[in-house]
C-alpha cells in the first residue's frame, strides 16, 4: 500500500472527527489523536503511524483506530503478523474511574494483499502510577486467538519535555504462516520517546526502540529473510485536537 492510501486513511479519520451536539442533556465530545513516526535502522527502515478518533460522552463512546507500518520500499511491514495496516471500530463504556471496556471488529491488511478480520474486545485506561494500558483480545476469521498489550507512561521532565517509556507485546494461540504469525509470544518491543510539547496539541519527538520476535514467529520472519531483532532510532510527531 502506497503513500496515497495512507492519505486516504487519514482523511477518513478527519471526516469522522466532526463537532458533536448535546444529546439527552449530556454533553457529547469528539477527539482525534495521531502519531507519525520514522523508524530508522540500517536494515529495515520504515514509516509508522497510529491514529484514533472517538465521539461520545463521559460514559459511552464510539472509537475508531487505525495504525500501520510501511517499509521504505513501499511494502506493508507485517511485523511477524502483529501489525500490517490495522483498522478497529469499538463501542466502549466506562466501567470504573479512568477505565473503559470496549468491544468491536477489526480488519487488517498485510503485505501481498492478505487480510484478516475478526472480533476484538478489551479494556483501556490508567493503571496505578499513571501507566496507560490498552489490552485487547481478538479472534480472527481463521480461528486464531490473540492478545495484545500496549503500555506507556509519561514522565514529566519539565513543563514541556516529557519522556515516555513504552511496551508492546502480542501472543497468539496458533500459527498463521500466511502472515508470519506464530503461536505463543510472537513479538515484544521496548522503547523510549522523548517529546517536546511546543503546544499541548503539537509535539515533535525522538526516541529509540528495541524489537524482538520470538518462538515460531521468529522462525517465519527469519525464513522470509527479515531480521528477528532490531534496534531503531525514532523521529516523529504527536498531535491531537
Q: Model segments located where?
A:
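Bacterial N-terminal signal peptides that target proteins for export
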Residues: 1-9
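Outer-membrane beta-barrel initiation region
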Residues: 2, 21-73, 89, 233
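N-terminal signal peptide c-region/cleavage motif recognized by signal peptidases
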Residues: 17-19
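Outer-membrane beta-barrel transmembrane domain signature
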Residues: 28-33, 130-132, 136-241
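Transmembrane beta-strand segments that form the barrel wall of outer-membrane beta-barrel proteins
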Residues: 32-40, 60-77, 99-109, 130-140, ...
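Outer-membrane beta-barrel architecture
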Residues: 35, 50-54, 88-92, 122-124, ...
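Solvent-exposed loop/turn segments connecting transmembrane beta-strands
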Residues: 38-47, 69-85, 107-117, 137-148, ...
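Gram-negative (and chloroplast) outer-membrane scaffold detector with strong preference
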Residues: 88-164
